[in-house]
Amino acid sequence: MAFFKKVACFTDIHFGLKGNSRVHNDDCEAFVIWFIEQARAEGCETCIFLGDWHHHRSATNVSTMNYTVSNMERLGAAFEKVYVIMGNHDLYYRDKREINSMEYIRNIPNIHIVNEWLVADDVAIIPWVVEDEWKKIEKMKQKYVFGHFELPYFKMNAMVEMPDVGGIQTDHFAGCGKVFSGHFHKRQIMKNVTYMGNAFPHNYADAWD
């Protein structure tokens, strides 16, 4: 049985941005409602969120937590399966995944937190890569890969390119089919890797990206 029939994805919504602004969180909620409407119209039964649901790593505001619960419940009711990838902003530490800010949504029906590599059939769903995990990627042959990757030579914004600091590279995915990633907010494609871009512009740096 296929891992999914038709999937809808979004990424980098950053609930809690702008000092846990209610205006921003309302914008996020409006996007989720719109996204569900579009996904239903296209017949998507599965949702994959590609990381950075929250903005603040070290603390989650109570108001923002309430937005998270209500919108995760909304997604869980709309899809048969919702996979929520842990991005770097969802993790307390940048270099390990032992603590994340999303555990309290784990028991919402149809919600699946992806805090460890999930490989099934021809699909891989990968959280923020830590330590030397990237070395496993070259051996992968999955048709579809979803993750929150920090790949060199992609644009971090319209002006600044991610430098090559060693480690994970775009060419490591050469054995895979299509790769879809969150993290960089500018929508862009290089080889078989697509950065989807954030859900909507969060500031002037994101405008028209």
Cite the ranges covered by each PLM segment:
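Conserved beta-sheet core of the metallophosphoesterase superfamily
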Residues: 151, 157-209
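Hydrophobic/aromatic beta-strand patches that form the interior of the parallel beta-sheet core
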Residues: 8, 48, 83, 114, ...
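A structural signal for the main folded, soluble domain(s) of proteins
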Residues: 2-6, 33-34, 131-133, 145, ...
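Active-site-proximal beta-strand elements of phosphoester/diester hydrolases
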Residues: 5-17, 121-130, 144-148, 194-197
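Binuclear metal-dependent hydrolase catalytic cores centered on His/Asp/Glu-rich metal-binding motifs
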Residues: 117-171
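Active-site glycine-centered loops adjacent to acidic/histidine catalytic or metal-binding residues
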Residues: 12, 51-52, 87-88, 148, ...
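Conserved protein kinase catalytic core
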Residues: 15-18, 58, 93, 133, ...
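Core catalytic region of metal-dependent phosphoesterases/phosphodiesterases
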Residues: 6, 13, 17-118, 172-176
